[in-house]
Amino acid sequence: MAPLDLEEILKKHKAAKAEAAKPRFIPRGQRKKMEEEKKLKVEEEQKRQQEELQKTRSELQKAREELAGLQRVRRQEQSRSRESDHSVPTGPRAMRSYDDDSFNGNGNGSNSNRNNNNNQRDRQDASTKTNGSRTAEEVQEEKKYLERYTGPPAKVSTFSANKKRRRTTDQKFNFDWDPKDDTSQPWRYEETGAHERSANGATEQVRRKKATRDYNDPRLVPWQDKELSQMTTRDWRLFKVNLEIVTKGNNIPNPMRFWEESNLPHVLKDTIKQVGYTEPTPVQRAAIPIALQCRDLIGISKTGSGKTAAFVLPMLSYIEPLPPLNEVTKTEGPYALILAPTRELATQIQAEVIKFATRMGFTVVCLIGNKRTIEEDAFALRNGAEIIVATPGRLVDCLERHLLVLSQCSYVVLDEADRMVDGGFEDSIHKILAALPPSNGKPDDRDAEDPNIMSKFLTPNLRYRQTVMYSATMPPSVERIAKNYLKHPAMVTIGTIGEAVDTVEQQAMWVVSEDERRNKLRAMLNTYGTGKLVIVFVNTKSNCDAVAKDLKSSSFSAVTLHGNKTQDQREAALQSFRDGRTNVLVATDVAARGLDIPDVSLVINFNMAGTIEVYTHRIGRTGRAGKEGMAITFCGPEDHGVLYHLKQIMSKSQMSKVPPWLKDHPEAQSKPTF
């Protein structure tokens, strides 16, 4: 007999498994026959179960009858044993002390009765003497024992009028004055001592609980004072609840508590200290450990939460092991790609990346339209770049003109994905992601969740492509992109989607005319905006220039930011505003999202946003990084469609108060149906 070939057996097994996994067509008649067989099996199984149940019931009934028969036999035997007992009857207990002669007719019955009575009197006298020799406390103690074990004597009431009166009046408030009360002085509840008496029991309970508390219990130690190895499952759960971190997915690592505990390279940790990042934000705590495991990631967080560093640091850590670009590899494109919806946000991200990438020797190139021509972009790419930050439109132009390829791109970031889709860049995103090399795509199975497999190098210059998406909301269009291009992603949600920043005080004012709107704007700037950075949002470009001109005529220093400005003009306006040379920035929604301008203390919505989502992002320009801010909104008759949502979002804020006009407005009472 020839020896078994293990490879042949495995090959046959694999072929059989693949054959079984293939879908096969089943004719209609065969399907009907299979359904009938399945139905017949179900009926047979039900019939078998009923028979077993009936059999069990009959056995129980038979056992019950046997037990009853045994009990009858036992009673009969006891009855026969009583009948066979021939002992002399003793008679009634009261007559046992009589002499036998009294029953024999000797006429001595009366003497016996007298003797019995005398004996009873003697016993009573002895009992009285015994009771007399005991103290009153002993007698009372005996009565208590008797009442405890035998109950109170018959026909003896246990009612206590004092107890009932105290029980019924304890919780009642006395509205009448006592004749002894001094009504000339104001009555003070604290002076009566009633609050002390009512809280006495609770205070004593708290005192006892504190006295018995074990202060060495590790559960009472805050997570900041614990070593990483001492953190329990309960500690991590409370940690995530306190920071409003919600994660979804398999094999999610625990969040990062401190920068020192992260697995980032030492060069990045040193740079973090130099730039002054003392403590990670919630999105950084949750997202960085997941991204460092080479997992695809979807991050949903409110504006101003530190999302840029949350994807920049893992990106640099991922491409650090790749070799430096040379004359050959520099033509293959970048190692990492970051897409942003606006030119301002792309420029801001480039500045953030340069902070950390310079010490690692990486080159960062920003591709945005309007600032420079396509030829200038080609010149910037002549020596290659490890990292490219771009807007979707300009990057598609570079790809179509063959100025750039993405043959070795291993890390892709989609920042503000919902904003890119809303801006009409969905087709551009699909074109860019389709231009990525399929050779380093992740498998669409559980291997995509295994960090050991995903961290492998496919070639010396190529790793599995990791895709990261950040957004403030998750509309269906963004979900489609995530479903098509992200493989088994982990999801991180910080706070509640669509809510405003908790550190912003919101105010809303009703205005009727344009003149009233301008007068209130000047009044708010004089009241709250003196010496502070203020952003004024308008809905149209023409109105943006008109409002800025009106403010300048009122001796306010103002600059404008809208889509008709060139890139140089927009950057100059932003730089002037950041430096404090101008304290009022009048802008359209182009500055509503993504821009991180520190120390903005006031946002004024000269025109209410068309949707509550845009409103949320507008007021998110202030109150960033834990600082407090204020947002003032002017509403008019044209804003009826968003009044309900504005009322809801203001009522959820602990720092804001819904004004009476908005609370009672008819359009704010029910959700609009359009």
Swiss-Prot record:
Q: Which PROSITE patterns match?
A: DEAD_ATP_HELICASE, HELICASE_ATP_BIND_1, HELICASE_CTER, Q_MOTIF
The record ties this protein, via SMART domains, to: DEXDc, HELICc
Q: What is its EC number?
A: 3.6.4.13
Compositional bias per record (Low complexity), positions renumbered to this chain: 103-119
Top EC class for this record: hydrolase
Q: Which residues hold ATP?
A: S301, K302, T303, G304, S305, G306, K307, T308
One GO molecular function term of this record is:
ATP binding
Q: Where is the motif DEAD box annotated in this sequence?
A: 415-418
Q: Pfam families annotated for this entry?
A: DEAD, Helicase_C
Question: What Gene Ontology terms describe where this protein resides (cellular component)?
Answer: cytoplasm; nucleus
GO BP annotations, alphabetical order: mRNA processing; RNA splicing
* SUPFAM superfamilies associated with the record: P-loop containing nucleoside triphosphate hydrolases (SSF52540)
Q: Where is this motif: Q motif?
A: 257-285
Name the reaction it catalyses.
ATP + H2O = ADP + phosphate + H(+)
Kindly list the places in or outside the cell where this protein is found, as annotated in its UniProt entry: Cytoplasm; Nucleus
* Compositional bias (Basic and acidic residues): 32-67, 74-86, 135-147, 168-198
Give start and end of each Helicase ATP-binding domain. 288-492
Annotated region Disordered: the residues are 14-213
Q: Which keywords are on file for this protein? A: ATP-binding, Cytoplasm, Helicase, Hydrolase, mRNA processing, mRNA splicing, Nucleotide-binding, Nucleus
Please give the family membership noted in the entry.
Belongs to the DEAD box helicase family. DDX23/PRP28 subfamily.
Tell me the subunit arrangement: Component of the U5 snRNP complex.
Q: What does this protein do?
A: ATP-dependent RNA helicase involved in mRNA splicing. May destabilize the U1/5'-splice site duplex to permit an effective competition for the 5'-splice site by the U6 snRNA, resulting in the switch between U1 and U6 at the 5'-splice site. May also act to unwind the U4/U6 base-pairing interaction in the U4/U6/U5 snRNP, facilitating the first covalent step of splicing.
Please state what the annotation says regarding this protein's domains. Answer: The Q motif is unique to and characteristic of the DEAD box family of RNA helicases and controls ATP binding and hydrolysis.
Q: What is this protein called?
A: Pre-mRNA-splicing ATP-dependent RNA helicase PRP28
Q: Which organism is it from?
A: Pyricularia oryzae (strain 70-15 / ATCC MYA-4617 / FGSC 8958) (Rice blast fungus)
